[in-house]
Amino acid sequence: MRPDRVVAPPVSPQIGQGIVVQDVRVCYCNGHTALYDASFAIPTGTIAALVGVNGSGKSTLFKAIMGFLRLAQGQIRVLDMSVQDALRRNLIAYVPQSEDVDWNFPVLVEDVVMMGRYGHMGMLRRPKAADHAAVDAALARVNLADLRKRQIGELSGGQKKRVFLARALAQESRVILLDEPFTGVDVKTEDQIIALLQDLRCEGRVMLVSTHNLGSVPDFCDRTILIKHTILAFGATSEVFTQANLEQAFGGVLRHFVLQSASPHAAGRDASIGVFTDDERPLILRNGKAQARPARARDDTHDAP
């Protein structure tokens, strides 16, 4: 049975669009095609999830949006301008995976956040009052102002994630790419990060979140991209997260269980419950569709040092 492919119709770049990827193909020097026929459009004021198995092209797509890879075909527009123009204006920020950072490098929290201001400084890279003010505001927003003089390697996993979010805020970026922001953090920290992303969405920013944590995606992502060297499905998360689409994207990687109610009174929303799990955070499908969990109480307090 062919999966229920959900792909948004082609959209021409215009005001209000954050990231537009049109018919993109990326090939490496060895001839390997890492990504092909990739098309989607994410409007401003949106949180979108990028979901797929390891090696499916997520990192390639991020690198293409950041301008690190030459496109063999197609184009990428960011905020109705070329990637190069968006980068020159410091409009794209990247929050890396934890394993991509050398936590032993001796640098203070405030210095990491100040790196987000480099594009706003002159040739000598001397921070001005506006740069210090931006760093202060960013640290306060992620509740880490009291840890600014700490070595970043001394922080907890969740605090480290929030430092790089603060760097993106100090940069004054409008598009933020987050690579596995919930890996190695507890539920409380995950909720804090999600709350911040939701606030940024209200400000009209665009966030593309690469994650393996399927269970949390329906809670905060407006749209979802399923990727496997091409775009398998793109659209509203509730429409993309179907059993057929997930089996095509994750077949053989995630365990899948279906619970079918035998009760004649279960013809409603709980007649069929599917579970996709990798033992981290299961994704629950009710009658074949993903649903967000009830919102938990918001807690803006930071982790203990």
Residue ranges of predicted features:
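Conserved ABC ATPase "signature" region
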Residues: M114, A129-L147
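ABC ATPase nucleotide-binding domains
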Residues: Q243-A244, Q248-P305
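Conserved ABC transporter NBD signature motif
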Residues: G74-D85, I92
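Catalytic Walker B motif of ABC-type/P-loop ATPase nucleotide-binding domains
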Residues: I176-E180
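Conserved ABC ATPase signature
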Residues: Q151-L155, Q159
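Helix-to-loop junction immediately C-terminal to a conserved catalytic motif
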Residues: M66
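A short, flexible loop at the N-terminus of ABC-type nucleotide-binding domains that lies
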Residues: R2-D4, A8-V21, R25-D37, T44
